[in-house]
């Protein structure tokens, strides 16, 4: 129903934001936000990144006090600091190839494959990925990517 989707897209949602004001006390701040509104990506300066990396080398995790201090020093919000550290830990975990037990079990059963095809895939690979049969004797399902997603194999 297109009438419903138009109304749905224009609806405003209330979000609850917790503002840290000290140990174990929080104030609730309410604000309205459009459903399709997205926060812009944070562009860290070179000096901010250098300082964040330096702090990360000392410890992968920050105390609340250290996060507050770093946020003030770098003129960033505590959330930006927290998310940067979370993303950095996730990036390292992904690069190390560590997977949880469930993911390993699913991979062993052939039920877990989040491989991607590289951007520089040639035109035949692209046609195959788009479901276009190029030779008449194979289908899209006949091709799989390797574990790193570096190439397609038949």
From Swiss-Prot:
Residues 127-154 are annotated as: Disordered. Gene3D superfamilies: Homeodomain-like (1.10.10.60). One of its GO terms (cellular component) is nucleus. Keywords: Developmental protein, DNA-binding, Homeobox, Nucleus. The keyword Nucleus applies. The keyword Nucleus applies. Residues 37-96 bind DNA. GO terms for molecular function: DNA-binding transcription factor activity, RNA polymerase II-specific; RNA polymerase II cis-regulatory region sequence-specific DNA binding. Residues 145-154 have a biased composition (Acidic residues). InterPro entries: Engrailed_Homeobox_TFs, HD, HD_engrailed, HD_metazoa, Homeobox-engrailed_C-terminal, Homeobox-engrailed_CS, Homeobox_CS, Homeodomain-like_sf. GO terms for biological process: neuron differentiation. Signal peptide: none annotated. Belongs to the engrailed homeobox family. PANTHER family: HOMEOBOX PROTEIN ENGRAILED, HOMEOBOX PROTEIN INVECTED. This is Homeobox protein engrailed.
């Amino acid at each position: 129903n297109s009438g419903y989707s138009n109304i749905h897209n224009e609806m405003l949602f209330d979000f609850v934001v917790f503002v840290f004001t000290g140990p174990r006390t929080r104030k609730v701040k309410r604000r309205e936000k459009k459903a399709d509104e997205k926060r812009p990506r944070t562009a860290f300066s070179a000096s901010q990144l250098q300082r964040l990396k330096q702090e990360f080398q000392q410890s992968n995790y920050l105390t609340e006090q250290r996060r507050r201090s770093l946020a003030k020093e770098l003129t960033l919000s505590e959330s930006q600091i927290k998310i940067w550290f979370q993303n950095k830990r996730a990036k390292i975990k992904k690069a190390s190839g560590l997977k949880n037990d469930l993911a390993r079990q699913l991979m062993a059963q052939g039920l877990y494959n989040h491989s991607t095809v590289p951007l520089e895939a040639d035109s035949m690979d692209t046609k195959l990925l788009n479901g276009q049969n190029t030779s008449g004797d194979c289908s899209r399902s006949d091709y799989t990517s390797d574990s790193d997603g570096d190439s397609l194999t038949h």
